[in-house]
Each structure stands twice: as C-alpha cells, then as structure tokens.
C-alpha cells in the first residue's frame, strides 16, 4: 500500500495504473493519479492529532481551497460540513481536536480527507483496526457505497472473514 501511494520506494517490478506505467515518488504523485490511502496507523500516518477535525479534512486539498494563495473559508466550511454530515462523524464541531475523537470517528476523518481529494482508487489498509463494532459497520457501508459509485477499492486486512465478507475478488 505504501509503495502504491508513493511513501516507500519500489525495489523491483512494474506498476500500471489506468493503462500507463506508474512510478509515484510521493503521495502527491499518487493523489494526482487519483489514488488515495487510508493508512493502517491513522494516528501516525493519517491524521495530525493536534489539529481540529476541519483542518484534517481539508489538509490534502488546501490548494483547491485557495484563490491567489488565500484560503477561502466559505469553501472550506462547505467541504468540512459535507463530510462531517455524510460520514456521520460524531464531533461537537469541526474545531474539535481530532485526538479527542473515538477511534471510529478518527478513521472517518481520515476517510473524509481522502474523499475530499476525489480519488478514483482508494486503498483501505486495515480500515477497521481499533474501532468498535458499530463504527466497523459504518466503514463497511461506506466502502460498499463508494464501490457502487464506481470507486475502485483495495482492501488490506489481517482478518480473513472481513476480506471474504467485503470483497468481490481476493
């Protein structure tokens, strides 16, 4: 997952994405190709724990939320509100520090950040690790909905029943 997303360097082989040779050198390269990663370790790799929910959601799309290098607060608020509502992120408000959310809601913030980039391919690396049963079901439902919308989902999990239950192909 980290190689596909451009975090780690590939040692050998060839990757093809959308019919073209694909060699990401950074996550930015992956995002430009429409590939997003919901990482295994959300606290170390997916979130900035000391920032509010809203800032985490738009972190990957700040360039799209600015005009002449000035952030457009109205646009940012619309995006954040859309994903907080759509993903049912339980937070008192978008200024709540993400470190104070439950594991399931933190995972939804990571997902919101990737959805805001409008990626066509989403890599879910251990998407339900460390979250409660209710949040797991919500994540599963979101993954199915994304697949129905035409998004390609790559799921990595150490739980075989989870893979069997969620996958078209293994």
Positions of PLM-derived features:
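Glycine-rich phosphate-binding loops of nucleotide-dependent enzymes
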Residues: 1-170
């Amino acid at each position: 997952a980290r190689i596909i997303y451009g975090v780690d360097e590939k040692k050998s082989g060839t990757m093809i994405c959308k019919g073209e040779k694909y060699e990401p050198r950074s996550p930015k390269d992956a995002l430009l190709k429409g590939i997003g990663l919901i990482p295994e370790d959300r606290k170390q790799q997916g979130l900035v724990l000391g920032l509010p929910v809203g800032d985490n959601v738009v972190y990957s799309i700040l360039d799209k939320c600015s005009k002449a290098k000035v952030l457009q607060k109205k646009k940012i608020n619309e995006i954040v509100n859309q994903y907080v509502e759509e993903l049912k992120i339980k937070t008192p408000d978008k200024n709540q520090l993400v470190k104070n959310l439950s594991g399931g809601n933190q995972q939804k913030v990571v997902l919101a950040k990737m959805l805001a980039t409008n990626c066509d391919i989403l890599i879910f690396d251990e998407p339900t690790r460390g979250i409660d049963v209710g949040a797991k079901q919500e994540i599963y439902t979101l993954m199915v909905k994304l697949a129905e919308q035409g998004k390609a989902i790559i799921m990595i999990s150490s739980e075989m029943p989870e893979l069997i239950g969620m996958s078209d192909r293994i």
